[in-house]
Curated annotation (Swiss-Prot):
Pfam families: MerR, Resolvase. Residues 59-191 form the Resolvase/invertase-type recombinase catalytic domain. The keyword DNA-binding applies. GO terms for biological process: DNA integration; regulation of DNA-templated transcription. This is Putative resolvase L103. It comes from the Viruses. GO terms for molecular function: DNA binding; DNA strand exchange activity. Keywords: Coiled coil, DNA integration, DNA recombination, DNA-binding. Resolvase catalyzes the resolution (a site-specific recombination) of the cointegrated replicon to yield the final transposition products. The keyword DNA-binding applies. Residues 65-91 form a coiled coil. InterPro entries: DNA-bd_dom_put_sf, MerR-type_HTH_dom, Recombinase/Transposase-rel, Recombinase_CS, Resolv_N, Resolvase-like_N_sf, Transpos_IS607. It comes from Acanthamoeba polyphaga mimivirus (APMV). Residues 11-30 bind DNA.
Amino acid sequence: MPKYVRRKEVLEVLKVHYQTLYRMEEKGLIEVKRTNGGHRLYNLEKYLRDNGLDNKEKKGICYCRVSSKKQIKDLNRQVEYMEKNYPEYEIIKDIGSGINMERKGLLQLIQMAIDGEISEVVVTYKDRLARFGFELIEWIIKTYSNGQIKIIHKREEETPEEEITRDILQIMNVYVAKINGKKSGKLKAKK
């Protein structure tokens, strides 16, 4: 939730005259809202972030993910590639379904974006970040951190039918795995 501050604080931080601040408001350069009493409150944090004045050290992030522990070799290959090509970037690893939006690493990445700490996120493929909701994550990174997502390998363009078919198969695989996992757990409990 944005933090709004009084005019005095904005004037001190930006070192501008109050008339300049009003002109900025009129031009839509700074977000403002009025209290019930008619006082102006400004979203200084957003203004500083949007104009690169927030002084936060932004990081590059390499996000690596595989669906299961059986694919740990693929995860290690992703990490190796990222370490070689992006040595100064922080690496976040996840093991879990691309449909699961509560992965520890993904939540860490989103929190960093909301805190304005990300300059760029690098993933090998778009679906490594998320099978669904990629555009929302991209929007969060852009809006809160003024960052971007870089996809190293882009898949060939799919027709809408191919994309929907692939998505449905992925969803079915996740739920079949859940059902089989529950059955397996029940069998182990009986033994």
